[in-house]
Amino acid sequence: MMITQELELKENISQDVIFPPNDLYSDEPPVETELHLEQIMLLIKCLKWLWKDRYDFYAAGNLTIYYSPNQKKSEYFRGPDFFVVLGTERKTRKSWVVWNEDGKYPNVILEILSPTTANTDREYKKELYQNTFRTPDYFWFDPYTLEFAGFHLLDGKYQPLEANEKGHLWSEQLNLYLGIHEGLLRYFTPEGKLVLTPEETAERLAAKLRELNIDPNTI
């Protein structure tokens, strides 16, 4: 969320109003470009597909996180482009309300850079996620310039992650690599294999069947 938009929201909401936790909808504005949306949806789709048998995580994008110690919607909120919380119930949410989620903050956050948000993502948000959220893994990615960086929280401070020989960065929290593939950020297994989307999985299966002279449309 842009800082000016956040300030406008705060001015329009009474500081004394305490909202019921279950009524907190996300305040995040639309994503900046179609490519931003494609990248966010790709990360969510791939992780949910890979972890389809798991029910102990929550992955979302462009969703507001409310973290006010006073349990007020009007103060202390932020909406990462993509985040993952581990050790929680996998269910649909209107927003992530820290005081309604046993005090849990995201384990992984990724921000998608743009000309209007890049400096905030690199500086202010990095400090916020380090000092307040205490998020173990923080990444940012620019789908236009392909700038990609990652950090891991060590002794309370973010330390830059070193890329492997393929340029991938390791997420200790996800037990996966993140790396650029065909211009978009994707997951890779510890062995370096691309984590496929459901559509890619189906396409590869269909191709394999055709190699065996089996028409996939007949199955």
Region spans (language model):
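A structural signal for short, well-ordered beta-strand segments and their strand-loop junctions
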Residues: Y58-A60, F139-D142
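C-terminal interaction segment
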Residues: M2-E32, L37, C46-W49, Y67-P80, ...
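A short acidic/basic microdomain associated with nuclease active sites
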Residues: Y55-S68
